[in-house]
UniProtKB/Swiss-Prot annotation:
Chief location: cytoplasm
Protein name, per record: Protein FdhE homolog
Stated family: Belongs to the FdhE family.
Organism: Pseudomonas aeruginosa (strain ATCC 15692 / DSM 22644 / CIP 104116 / JCM 14847 / LMG 12228 / 1C / PRS 101 / PAO1)
NCBIfam families attached to this UniProt entry: FdhE
InterPro entries reported for this sequence: FdhE-like_sf, FdhE_C, FdhE_central, FdhE_N, Formate_DH_accessory
Alphabetical list of Pfam families matching this protein: FdhE_C, FdhE_central, FdhE_N
Length: 309
């Protein structure tokens, strides 16, 4: 067995290298729900934000007390690590159906809704056959929102998110490795929902992309499009808020003229409580502004269908 002895300078350099990825905290959904309730106060979409906050509370309850599940295939996990592939590849796991008990548990735990449309959506999911549920899930995770009813999206997306976050938190250290694609989640292969500009210690100023499905965050250099990887002529757009200058805005969208896409970025320096999903839902006015300017949203939010609110 060969051994490498690090010299003092190498040890210091290694200690200053920021981690490639971060797992979500085990109270992710509880904190997200609290953030949504905070943002809902006086917001024109307050009712929807409160509905999603309720879903987040249910997600947290399921994460704390998960349904009975078969363990993930250890041989597949080994091969994924060996070949630099996402161990929780969503396209494969969705088709295998290991996430379906999470959907059943979420539907069983959701309180009787007063809203008739919500009740109808829940009933449609309950009555759907396994094949239909899988088809809807594939459509949602591949961004084909026109292939599933918009009213189903928040509930289907919530079940998928908590299932994948549970699996991610259960992986052994080192199971997730850097993959060839830096623009997709190294854990599950999903696109990012937003970028988080970190604040604190050696990570200050670094950007981590937040996965739309499993909530893994992975390091991605700044001033580089998270869709086409172009670095030229990127611009940053924010909405005026309480008279704050643009350079102190919590939210700024990074726009790319090469692919006409954009990604929202949240600067934790100015609000350490910002949450990728909650703050994204609360800032759809910025999406509308960007759409008017001809930019396309490349980052999905699994709890909202485009045009569905």
């Amino acid at each position: 067995m060969s051994r490498t002895i690090l010299q003092p300078g190498q040890i210091e350099a290694a200690a200053n290298i920021p981690p490639h990825l971060h797992q979500p905290s085990r109270d992710l959904f509880a904190r997200r729900g609290e953030r949504l309730l905070q943002l809902a106060e006086g917001h024109p979409m307050g009712d929807y934000l409160r509905l999603v906050a309720g879903l987040c509370r249910l997600q947290q309850a399921l994460l704390d007390n998960p349904p009975a599940l078969a363990p993930l295939d250890p041989e597949r996990l080994r091969k994924s690590r060996e070949h630099g592939m996402p161990p929780l590849a969503y396209d494969l796991l969705v088709r295998e159906g290991a996430w379906l008990p999470w959907l059943d548990a979420l539907l069983a735990g959701y309180p009787a809704p007063a809203n008739a449309a919500v009740g109808a959506a829940l009933e449609q999911l309950r009555e759907a056959e396994e094949g239909q549920r899988k088809a809807w899930a594939i459509a949602l995770l591949s961004g084909q929102f026109d292939l599933l009813p918009a009213a189903l999206v928040p509930f289907l997306g919530a079940a998928l998110q908590v299932a994948w976050s549970h699996w991610l938190l259960g992986l052994e250290e080192g199971a997730v490795v850097e993959t060839e694609s830096r623009t997709l989640c190294p854990a599950c292969g999903s696109p990012p929902m937003a970028g988080m500009i970190r604040q604190g210690g050696k990570e200050t100023g670094l950007r981590y992309l937040s996965c739309s499905l499993c909530a893994c965050e992975w390091h991605y250099v700044r001033i580089k499009c998270s869709h086409c990887e172009e670095s030229k002529h990127l611009a940053y757009l924010s909405l005026e808020h309480d008279g704050q200058p643009a350079e102190k805005a919590v939210l700024r969208a990074e726009t790319c003229p090469s692919c006409q896409g954009y990604l929202k970025q949240f600067y934790l320096e100015f609000d350490r409580h910002a949450d990728a999903l909650a703050d994204d839902l609360a800032s759809l006015a910025l999406d509308m502004r960007l759409a008017e300017d001809g930019y396309l949203r490349r980052s999905p939010n699994l709890l909202l269908a485009p045009g569905g609110e």
